[in-house]
């Protein structure tokens, strides 16, 4: 699949390929490893100064949510859909409108749901840190508490959905993955064709996007 991008400022048209699955996976893996290293550093520092496990768990959960939100939502929103390793590998996530919202939707089943659930659990464990049976109850498969059962079912459902996303992703090389379809976005690679489009702009209907995207995206020109 290709995306045609028209830049009115330079009067050029760029034809972009949807990214290959292996390139996307490599960028995501490298980005995740980078964040995991930062998270490990935070854990090491927290463990030195804080001995209470519930407090460390809360700090780690909040840190993970903030790091991932900053890196996978805020940074791409401000930097034309790029993260550090997307930029190094020539990738960019194009989003037509409601950028930050659709970036959040794009990451929803990758880490957002897990972050929200574990943040809620971390707060609950911290509030009830004086009760040693709370954490034990969560890992007790015989526990009939409806709240715990609901949380476990929710985590299981999200895990299954994640698996579906991963399987679909493996067969969506140079096409939109499920998270792209949900967020109305395209993960694209370097331009394969750039030409003057001054005359073409006069006869082509375009849809305005954010000014810091590569240009105006001609939806009628999208094709396989």
Curated annotation (Swiss-Prot):
The chain crosses the membrane at residues 25-45, 56-76, 107-127, 149-169. Its main location: membrane. It is a multi-pass membrane protein. This is Uncharacterized protein MG243 homolog. InterPro entries: RDD. Signal peptide: none annotated. One of its GO terms (cellular component) is plasma membrane. Keywords: Cell membrane, Membrane, Transmembrane, Transmembrane helix. It is found in: Cell membrane. The keyword Translocase does not apply. The keyword Chaperone does not apply. Pfam families: RDD. It comes from Mycoplasma pneumoniae (strain ATCC 29342 / M129 / Subtype 1).
């Amino acid at each position: 699949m290709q995306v045609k991008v028209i830049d009115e400022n330079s009067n050029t048209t760029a034809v972009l390929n949807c990214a290959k699955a292996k390139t996307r996976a490599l960028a995501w893996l490298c980005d995740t490893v980078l964040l995991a290293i930062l998270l490990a550093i935070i854990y090491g520092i927290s463990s030195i100064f804080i001995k209470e496990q519930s407090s460390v768990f809360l700090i780690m959960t909040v840190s993970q949510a903030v790091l991932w939100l900053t890196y996978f939502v805020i940074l791409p929103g401000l930097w034309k859909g790029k993260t550090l390793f997307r930029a190094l590998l020539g990738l960019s996530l194009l989003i037509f409108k409601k950028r930050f919202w659709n970036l959040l939707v794009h990451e929803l089943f990758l880490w957002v749901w897990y972050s929200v659930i574990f943040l809620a659990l971390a707060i609950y464990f911290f509030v009830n840190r004086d009760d040693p049976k709370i954490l034990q109850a969560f890992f007790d498969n015989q526990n009939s508490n409806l709240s715990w059962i609901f949380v476990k079912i929710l985590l299981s459902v999200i895990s299954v959905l994640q698996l579906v996303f991963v399987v679909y992703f493996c067969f969506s090389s140079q096409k939109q993955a499920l998270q792209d379809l949900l967020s109305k976005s395209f993960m694209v690679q370097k331009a394969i064709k750039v030409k003057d489009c001054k005359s073409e702009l006069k006869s082509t209907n375009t849809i305005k996007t954010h000014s810091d995207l590569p240009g105006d995206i001609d939806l009628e020109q999208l094709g396989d």
